[in-house]
Amino acid sequence: MSVLTPLLLRGLTGSARRLPVPRAKIHSLPPDEKLGIMELAVGLTSCFVTFLLPAGWILSHLETYRRPE
């Protein structure tokens, strides 16, 4: 590592430190009613089917996707 590296990095990040960072104004209230068991089951099942099932299918069939050498 060169002796100049810290100086170069400080020169690159120096101008970024002076920029104003906007703050998000997010306000939320507690839910009006709690979720029931059925809503939770439907939500978790749909997430599983949407994301994990296709990924598992692709990983289990990975050999068929490989290019022949």
Swiss-Prot record:
The record's SUPFAM superfamilies line, in alphabetical order, gives: Mitochondrial cytochrome c oxidase subunit VIIIb (aka IX) (SSF81431)
Main location class: mitochondrion
Keywords assigned by UniProt, alphabetized: Membrane, Mitochondrion, Mitochondrion inner membrane, Transit peptide, Transmembrane, Transmembrane helix, Ubl conjugation
**Pfam families the record matches:** COX8
Q: In which pathway does it act?
A: Energy metabolism; oxidative phosphorylation
GO CC list: mitochondrial inner membrane; mitochondrion; respiratory chain complex IV
Q: Which domain of life is it from?
A: Eukaryota
Locations listed in the record: Mitochondrion inner membrane
Mitochondrial intermembrane-facing ranges = 61-69
Kindly list the residue ranges recorded as spanning the membrane. Answer: 37-60
State which ranges are Mitochondrial matrix (membrane side): 26-36
Please report which protein family the annotation says this sequence is part of.
Answer: Belongs to the cytochrome c oxidase VIII family.
What does the protein in this record do?
Component of the cytochrome c oxidase, the last enzyme in the mitochondrial electron transport chain which drives oxidative phosphorylation. The respiratory chain contains 3 multisubunit complexes succinate dehydrogenase (complex II, CII), ubiquinol-cytochrome c oxidoreductase (cytochrome b-c1 complex, complex III, CIII) and cytochrome c oxidase (complex IV, CIV), that cooperate to transfer electrons derived from NADH and succinate to molecular oxygen, creating an electrochemical gradient over the inner membrane that drives transmembrane transport and the ATP synthase.
Name listed for the protein in its UniProt record: Cytochrome c oxidase subunit 8A, mitochondrial
Q: What is the lineage of its organism?
A: Eukaryota, Metazoa, Chordata, Craniata, Vertebrata
